[in-house]
Amino acid sequence: MTRVYLDHAATTPVDPEVAEAMARVYRDVPGNPSSIYAEGQAARALVDTAREQVAAAIGASPSEIVFTSGGTEADNLALRGALKARRGERDGLVTTSIEHHAVLDTARDLAEHAHVRFTVVDVAPDGRVPPSAIAAAIDDRTSLVSVMHANNEIGTLQPLAEIGAICRDRGVTFHSDAVQSVGALEFDVRRIPVDLVSLNAHKFYGPKGVGALYVRKGTRVATMQTGGGQEKGRRTGTENVAGIVGLGVAMRIATERRGRESARQAALRDRIIDGVLARVPDAILTGHRTERLPNNASFVIRGTDGASVVMALDLEGFAVSSGSACTSGDTEPSHVILALGIDREAAKGSLRVTVGRGTTDADVDAFIATLPKVVDHVRGTAAVSA
């Protein structure tokens, strides 16, 4: 059976050029980047090159890039570090109801253990947060606002420029989890007034276990761990040289291909959306119809259980998701889908389909042809069991 991978929001295949670049590091560069002899300096040069590649992709200075173990660590460093840096001055955090658990769970932990005031702003039924709602939630004690650029489940894009302008006017640090969007869409910190941005290599055909946090010059972020003082003391620990090289190469490739790939994937996305809505009764598109990631088609299919649909599609050769891969084993409906105002029973039928570089027209045709049969089977099984 030929497999069709349609879960690129969960992770992407490592680009062969990325894998080869990493293999060369493992094979030829044994040094520690902190060492002053030749082997160490060779490793340091590779880390510096990757830092330049990441910075160039988002319009930043290399000195503003901090390497991490991934998006979750970047989110934690942003929230915990920014709030700790302003402890005693301001203690408020504002975020939205559809953030990734790396933000929401961190915010809850800070509220419980660090006496942070935690405010959650609701989103509209299409997943967009009104900038006016963020403005209304900010008060004199607000230290940090965290709003993701693109939602990992429904693909909705947020108006970061407007929100950032509000934060800047109010003297509030602004963080955005851009894990899903950087690499797929243009993201330029020279035009978006954002202070902290989280990135993750494996979302744009790089390796798992490495990411970065953009820290705008002048933004205060306290370190969350102690040790050797790497990354200018912000993220101490010996650098993952091969992973960082992979991140840099993946970012360069994504930037080079972004324009044509985004347009191609958006066309495939729209074919999936139109096909599913036309052929699957009681299917509802989730997220904004146009302000969404170019590769994301997400739905609620009433009368189904998302996990059952995913497993049935798996048997037919398709890899899709019923939501975030980080919570796919959870039997509770997605907090993101519930935040859209969709009732709990319907929310159990969420389905996320995300295309990628390797997705073809034939793949999309096959998926659209298969899904209605799978949904009928799942609904029939559920009716018999009821």
Where does each model-flagged region fall?
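Pyridoxal 5′-phosphate
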Residues: M1-A386
